[in-house]
């Protein structure tokens, strides 16, 4: 078993409505509170970062599972949505919805379609970010599997 370490440097020179920066490997960006939460809305924010972590982990996990299963695809895309609730000034990351769209080869069998649906579900429970937030953030899956040319 091996532990992998990841590091992030953060700089926040001002107050609540100012702008900071983060740097982690290839990621270098400005950060601030989003406009929807009465911030300046510059760069990214923790809400987008959590959504991005969950979405990238999920789609990479799904692609790896499809490859290991020998399931050929023409296309794999996804949209994800994060829902943050604010009640009495308390911010709670309530739900993440993943909407993967899998397009299989035009000659894929019904067994391939069933396997793609199964892997879409399995990727959610196998992704390390999904496992890390499980029990704190509701995860919802709305997968679409089609044959090429449909």
From Swiss-Prot:
Q: Which Pfam families match?
A: OsmC
The superkingdom of the source organism is: Bacteria
Q: Which family does it belong to?
A: Belongs to the OsmC/Ohr family.
Q: What is this protein called?
A: Uncharacterized protein YmaD
- Species of origin reads Bacillus subtilis (strain 168)
The UniProt gene name for this protein comes to: ymaD
